[in-house]
């Protein structure tokens, strides 16, 4: 099985919260797709709570689109990582890491303005696979943490995993 790009970076050297360009690719029609690693937690030291990450998934996707879409950028998807340390964001375009970081901070501020769990989008059994597994309080605590710590940039050239550690 081929080694995925996300497993070629040294997770012991990642900062969090931090933005990283995980991958770029060009479609046959010439559009650039960029995948960002939005790392909320330091790998193997912190983890996002399951209800909080789920609620954040519902809120974050809309807020990020509100702030970032336009001027040649369109978000395709924002999905939580299986390890629960962050999200992957795939988009058409090439916004800078700083632009993404600023958008992320603005989105976290938006999360704090949600006043009631009933205001979480798509929070019903028809649109959500585990609609009872939510916590606005946990999502807002995650947002507070990001705002307090700010968002750094993780550079791939600083995180390249030593070949000797592959499959260690």
Swiss-Prot record:
| Binding positions for Fe cation per the UniProt entry | 54, 58, 128
- Top-tier EC class: lyase
Which keywords does the record carry? Autoinducer synthesis, Iron, Lyase, Metal-binding, Quorum sensing
Tell me its EC number(s), please.
4.4.1.21
Name the chemical reaction catalysed here.
Answer: S-(5-deoxy-D-ribos-5-yl)-L-homocysteine = (S)-4,5-dihydroxypentane-2,3-dione + L-homocysteine
GO biological-process terms attached to the record: quorum sensing
The answer on whether this UniProt entry bears the keyword Transcription regulation reads no
Q: What is this protein called?
A: S-ribosylhomocysteine lyase
């Amino acid at each position: 099985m081929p080694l995925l790009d996300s497993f070629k970076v040294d997770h012991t050297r990642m900062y969090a919260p931090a933005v990283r360009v995980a991958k770029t690719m060009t479609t046959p029609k010439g559009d650039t797709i960029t995948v960002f690693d939005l790392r909320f937690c330091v790998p193997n030291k912190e983890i996002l709570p399951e209800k909080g990450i789920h609620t954040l998934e519902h809120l974050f996707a809309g807020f990020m689109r509100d702030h970032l879409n336009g001027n040649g950028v369109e978000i395709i998807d924002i999905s939580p990582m299986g390890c629960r340390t962050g999200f992957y964001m795939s988009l058409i375009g090439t916004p800078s890491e700083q632009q993404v970081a600023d958008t992320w901070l603005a989105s976290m501020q938006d999360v704090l303005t949600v006043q009631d769990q009933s205001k979480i989008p798509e929070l019903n059994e028809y649109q959500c696979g585990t609609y009872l597994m939510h916590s606005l309080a946990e999502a807002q605590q995650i947002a507070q943490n990001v705002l307090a710590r700010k968002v750094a940039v993780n550079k791939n050239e600083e995180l390249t995993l030593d070949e000797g550690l592959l499959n260690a």
